[in-house]
Amino acid sequence: MHNLKLASVVVGLAMASSGFAATQIEWWHAMGGANGEKVDEMAKAFNDSQSDYEVKPVYKGNYTETMTSAIAAFRAKQQPAIVQVFEVGTASMMAAKGAIYPVYQLMKDSGQPFDESVYLSAVTGYYSNSEGQMLSMPFNSSTPVLYYNKDLFKKAGIDQAPKTWQEVESVAKKLQASGVTCGFTTAWQSWVQLENLSARHNVPFATLENGFAGVKTELTFNGPLQVAHIEKMGEWQKNGIFSYSGRTNDGAAKFYSQECAMFTESSAGYAGIKRNATFDFGVSELPYWEGKVQQPSNTIIGGASLWVLQGHSKEEYKGVASFLSYLSKASVQADWHQFSGYLPITKAAYDLTKEQGFYAANPGTETGVMQMTTGTPTANTKGLRLGNFVQIRGIIDEALESVWSGDVDAQTALNTAVERGNAQLRRFEKAND
C-alpha cells in the first residue's frame, strides 16, 4: 500500500513538472568567438524573461557548414526550428518552399504584432518577396566601408579620407611617398569590389532586378563600369597602390601591421579593428568613381538572417514568434549593434543607439548605417538574389585572382566568370523553376 502511494506521488509530480516544462526551441547559428558568446547571452536573456519557452542556441560552424547541416537535418527530419543563413543562401532558401515557414506568415499565425515598416528598408528588402513580405528575420547585417590609418595619413600630410576612387589613387601615392608599403587592401573582394561597386553606381550585377524578379536571371557584371574598375585595380596591384590579401578578411592583418594604410572591409569589422589596431583609425564610406555617377547609391548588405523551418509543433512556432519579437526590441537590437558592429535592423534601435551617445563616443560606427540608408533602394541596389551564389562567388574569386596575377586582362576574366556563373544559374533554374 505504501509503495502504491509512493508511486502515485511520483507519477503526480512527473505530470506536474511536465505541465510546467518550457517548450524547447533549437536555434542553429554560425556565430563563433565573442559573437557566439553574445548569442548565448541573448538566448538566456529571453529564456529568463518568461517561462513558456527555452531557446537553445547551437553553434554549427561557419556559414556554409551551418547551412549544409540544416539541409541535411531537414532531409533526416531532425531540423532545428531556426537556422541562421548567410545572405548568399537567400535564393536557395526561398526556393525551398516546403522547407521554410515565412516570417510574415509565422507572426500572423501566432498572433504576434508585426510591422514590417519599423525595419530598415535597405535591410529587409534583401529578405522580402515581391510583395514586400519578410521571409526571414534579419539578424546580423553589415555593409562595406573604408577604414583608414589616421596616423599614416597625418605623416603623409593627408587630412581627410578619400571619397572617390580617383582620390584613393592619389592618396595612396602620397602614402607610398611617405614610406608606406601599400595604399589599400580589401576583404571579401567579390562582395566589396564587384557586388557593392555595382550597387554604389546603380548598375545591375544581373538581369531581372539582380535576380529578385525570377530565376531566369543572367549575370551582367562584365559591363564597362565593372571592367574599368577591375582593370584599374589590376594596375594598382602591380605598383603597390593595392595589395591582394585573400578571398575572405585576411587583409585585416596588413591593416593592423600598418603595411596597408586603407582597408575596405565590412562595417562589422569595426570591433576587431578597434581591438587590434595600435594606431588612430577612421571610418569612411565606400568610395565611388567620380564622373560615373552623379550621386552614389546605397551599398548592399552582407551578413545573415534567421529562417524558420517547417516540421515543428504549433506551440514551438508560438515560441519562435515570441523570440523573434524579442530579438527585434530596440534595446536588444541596439545592444547587439553596439557590441558586434553589425547594423541595427530597426529605426528604433538606430535612434536608441544615437540617444545613448554611442556614435559620438565611437566615431565611424554610424557610417555603415548612413551609407545603407542613402536614398531609396532601386532594382540595382536592393540586393542580390542568385541561386548557387556560393559557387558563383568562388568563380568570381578565381577570375579576380587571374587579373591580380597579371595572367588575364579584366574584360576576359569577367567575361569568363559571367559565362561560368550563368551555367550555375541555369542549373539552379532547372532544379527550381
Question: Predicted regions span which residues?
Answer:
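Short, solvent-exposed loop/beta-turn-alpha elements that line the ligand-binding surface or hinge
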Residues: 104-119, 203-228, 275-276, 288-298, ...
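Extracytoplasmic/periplasmic substrate-recognition and gating elements
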Residues: 48-49, 76, 132, 156, ...
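C-terminal capping/gating helix-and-loop segments adjacent to ligand/active sites or protein-protein/ligand interfaces
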Residues: 129, 299-300, 364-420
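Hinge/lid segment of periplasmic solute-binding proteins
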Residues: 86-143, 163, 169, 195-199, ...
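Glycine-centered hinge/linker elements that transmit conformational signals in sensory
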Residues: 172-178, 214-245
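A structural signal for short loop-to-beta-strand junctions that line the ligand-binding cleft
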Residues: 72, 80-81, 112-152, 182, ...
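Extracytoplasmic "Venus flytrap"/periplasmic binding protein-like
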Residues: 41, 45-119, 151-163, 254, ...
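Extracytoplasmic/periplasmic solute-binding protein
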Residues: 130-139, 144, 169-218, 260
